């Protein structure tokens, strides 16, 4: 799988859901999010892991690694995950040890009011050299405009210029993409007939970027 690309169509949702089940991972209850998980979970390497925005984390329970696992969110899930330390706090100011983590994941979070500059700076502070950051997000191009909220937070579906800005900020902070971005998009997979928030009137897809710390 490419690690810097976009969800193209429903067939990819079906294929990645099957992939997770066949490889011993439990799939997400929102099936299109299995596209994110199927890219990230097999690629995670041994070492400390932090899921940034872990309220409904399918990463932490699925990650088959030896090493400490942490999650941070302003709102914690109402359950515990065996072997995982869950922290209530700001993912842009985690107060966790510097250069400690091998892997950071941030799944469908940065479109909800996250400051890209503060986020990138904190990720660089947390990652070991050679450690990876996986970021997924809601996406459509051209830009979907208008004021939207979801989960009580601002909801900014990213467009190409937004993503290019995020990449530039991350690179300036000290992380590089693991490969060139495949900017092609096909279908607005997430729509009112398939998992878009009820009444939102928007249609979009998912994107994934993978960075490595210098």
Language model features with spans:
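S-adenosyl-L-methionine-dependent methyltransferase catalytic module, highlighting the catalytic core
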Residues: 105, 114-124, 128-214
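Glycine-rich helix-loop-beta junction characteristic of Rossmann-like nucleotide cofactor-binding loops
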Residues: 41-46, 94-95
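Receiver (REC) domain switch-region micro-motif
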Residues: 49, 104, 109
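Short catalytic/ligand-binding loop motif for oxyanion handling, primarily in non-cytosolic enzymes
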Residues: 37, 56-61, 78-80, 95, ...
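A short acidic, Gly/Pro-enriched loop at the edge of an enzyme's catalytic core
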Residues: 92-104
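Class I SAM-dependent methyltransferase SAM/SAH-binding core
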Residues: 50-93
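Class I SAM-dependent methyltransferase Rossmann-like catalytic core
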Residues: 1-43
């Amino acid at each position: 799988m490419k690690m810097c690309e976009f969800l193209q169509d429903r067939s990819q949702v079906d294929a990645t859901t099957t992939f997770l089940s066949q490889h011993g991972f439990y799939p997400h209850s929102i099936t299109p999010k299995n596209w994110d998980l199927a890219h990230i979970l097999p690629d995670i390497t041994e070492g400390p892991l932090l899921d940034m925005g872990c309220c409904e984390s399918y990463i932490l329970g699925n990650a088959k690694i030896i090493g400490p696992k942490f999650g941070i969110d302003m709102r914690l899930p109402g359950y515990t995950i065996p072997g995982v330390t869950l922290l209530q706090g700001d993912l842009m100011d985690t107060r966790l040890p510097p250069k400690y983590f091998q892997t950071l994941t941030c799944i469908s979070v940065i479109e909800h009011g996250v400051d890209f500059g503060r986020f990138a700076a904190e990720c660089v502070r947390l990652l070991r050299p050679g450690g990876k950051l996986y970021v997924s997000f809601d996406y459509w191009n051209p830009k979907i405009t208008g004021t939207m909220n979801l989960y009580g937070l601002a909801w900014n579906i990213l467009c190409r210029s937004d993503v290019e800005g995020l990449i530039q900020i991350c690179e300036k902070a000290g992380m590089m993409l693991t490969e060139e971005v495949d900017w092609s998009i096909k279908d607005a997979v997430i729509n009112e007939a398939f998992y878009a928030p009820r009444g939102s009137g928007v249609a979009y897809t998912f994107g994934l970027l993978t960075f490595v710390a210098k």
